[in-house]
Amino acid sequence: MSNIIKQIEQEQMKQDVPAFRPGDSVEVKVWVVEGSKKRLQAFEGVVIAIRNRGLHSAFTVRKISNGEGVERVFQTHSPVIDSIAVKRRGAVRKAKLYYLRERTGKSARIKERLNRVG
């Protein structure tokens, strides 16, 4: 029984999800239905948390919009998500960046992660 469920979940999972970590700035394009119209909406911000649970994986993106902090949780393999693009790599030491909720301005900045050559 368990193998059948795993097989079905594997078929439902997206294969084109880019590798990103907490601290990275990402742009998530989401399909939004307004009345009879369907359009793409971009949500760009910093990944503050990732929850890896196979098909049920999710990640939280935080951005500042008009001086107000906005967080949105996305299901990684949801059909509502059109694309995920990594804009900038961030260097952080924690897996959950919930401390950014209390910070504003320069203290909320994240250093850019530089990849080693070698």
UniProtKB/Swiss-Prot annotation:
**NCBIfam families listed in its UniProt record:** rplS_bact (TIGR01024)
Q: Name one GO biological process term.
A: translation
Give yes or no: UniProt keyword Ribonucleoprotein: yes
* Database matches in SUPFAM superfamilies: Translation proteins SH3-like domain
Task: State the name under which the record lists this protein.
Answer: Large ribosomal subunit protein bL19
Q: Where are the transmembrane segments?
A: none
Give the function comment from the record.
This protein is located at the 30S-50S ribosomal subunit interface and may play a role in the structure and function of the aminoacyl-tRNA binding site.
Species per Swiss-Prot/TrEMBL record: Serratia proteamaculans (strain 568)
What Pfam family is a match, any one? Ribosomal_L19
Top-rank lineage group of the source organism? Bacteria
Which family does the entry's similarity section mention?
Belongs to the bacterial ribosomal protein bL19 family.
* Single GO MF annotation: structural constituent of ribosome
GO terms for cellular component: cytosolic large ribosomal subunit
Family matches, as PROSITE patterns: RIBOSOMAL_L19
Sorted alphabetically, the keyword list is:
Ribonucleoprotein, Ribosomal protein
Taxonomic path: Bacteria, Pseudomonadati, Pseudomonadota, Gammaproteobacteria, Enterobacterales
All disulfide bonds of the chain are none
